[in-house]
């Protein structure tokens, strides 16, 4: 005779099996592989932009005076970015949102072309929404911000050329956002 615990285990496993009922996985197409590789690359970009936000807006008075001395090649660029802090913040926010939305679209394309969820709407939601949100938060926000908060000046000096480029690239959007 089986115990009550075995009955509960069987019921739990049946519910878990029902969650995966009708789910099929197919080999990813070349387009799907490119999409997921681009998404991973953009996840690094998201982390870079998020880290830049913390680094540029967390510089200490000592860091700022060191930047004013201009000992490093990026110091003038950092000063120029900080002198237009509203536009800097607008550029960072626009860049981060653009990258994150693109990551979500690429991952949706990848999952839609490789995993067919059938009637498993809950599993589809869990995989695409919860897992993707977790990855974006962990690798695109939290970890990069922790690193840059501990290395503000060093990170700003490395990030200044790329952020200056983004400032120019998103200039029409950031300027219109500031003047709203």
Question: Where are the regions that the model predicts?
Answer:
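Membrane-embedded alpha-helical segments of inner-membrane proteins
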Residues: 9-178
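Short, small-residue-biased leader/transition segments that mark boundaries at the very start
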Residues: 1-8
């Amino acid at each position: 005779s089986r115990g009550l615990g075995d009955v509960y285990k069987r019921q739990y496993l049946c519910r878990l099996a029902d969650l995966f009922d009708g789910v099929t996985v197919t080999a990813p197409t070349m387009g799907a592989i490119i999409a997921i590789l681009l998404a991973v690359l953009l996840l690094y970009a998201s982390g870079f932009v998020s880290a830049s936000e913390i680094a540029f807006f967390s510089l200490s008075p000592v860091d700022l005076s060191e930047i004013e001395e201009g000992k490093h090649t990026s110091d003038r660029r950092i000063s120029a970015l900080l002198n237009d802090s509203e536009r800097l913040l607008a550029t960072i926010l626009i860049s981060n949102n653009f990258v994150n939305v693109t990551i979500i679209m690429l991952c949706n394309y990848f999952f839609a072309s490789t995993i067919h969820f059938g009637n498993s709407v809950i599993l589809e939601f869990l995989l695409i929404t919860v897992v993707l949100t977790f990855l974006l938060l962990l690798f695109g926000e939290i970890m990069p911000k922790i690193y840059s908060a501990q290395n503000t000046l060093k990170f700003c000096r490395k990030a200044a050329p790329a952020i200056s480029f983004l400032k120019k690239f998103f200039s029409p959007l950031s300027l219109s956002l500031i003047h709203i």
